[in-house]
Amino acid sequence: MFKSKKPIIDFKGTLGDELKSRRIALCITGSVATIKSPEIARELIRHGADVTCIMSDGALDFIQSMLMEWASQNDVITKMTGSMEHIQLIEEGPEKIDLLLIAPATANTLSKIASGISDTPVTLLASSALGSGIPIVAAPSMHSSLWSNSVVKENLDRLRTIKVDVLTPQIDEGKAKITSTEVIVDAVIRRLTPQDFSGIRVFVTAGPTYENIDPIRIISNKSSGKMGFALAREAWRRGADVTLVSGPTKLTPPVSID
């Protein structure tokens, strides 16, 4: 019977507690982007989450389950057994997950989920999660020709209509590369945050401003922009449509915000 471990993780919650007491199932499918999966697991934990990894056979062709066991500090599910792990993770109980994250998500896996096919540990758990109302976030990774395929597009649209958050990949070098870990973690946090700002448009100004006195002199301030960036990110996580305008700062703007 599958049971999560009681890990001792010295870095848990070091970046925040937005995911404290939240259980995330990180589903990993067969893509070269699986090399980012340990980083994704660790970042979720740094925001307070408990992470359980589920790997398809294709994912195991790229990385070993031992790596994800180390990254998550939990047992890894690589096949479904008579213990019915896909039921343990979605029914009320100590192992129940709050969200299912598929990262990376291949065209094959996404199309199977859209069609109700459940022939791998990942697709079986996804089908169970959909039937139980558990939120799903997917981070696609595939060649650009697959991303542009009309059938794949139809399948992605079908997933969106049933409330699966399909993140936009980074189109680069002829590939639809998995989006950044920051975007993935932000999407998970947003999906698990009450959307009490939904339908609200928020305009945030951050950082220093400059007002000319004459062609040489200005009036300014030493604002770092941290407060404005934090307010913009929090409003976005709570469902707002956020526009952020910033003066020159040393900060990197939140990538999920315009």
Language-model segments: what does each one mean?
Residues 1-225, 229-258:
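A cross-family phosphate/adenosyl-ligand binding-site feature
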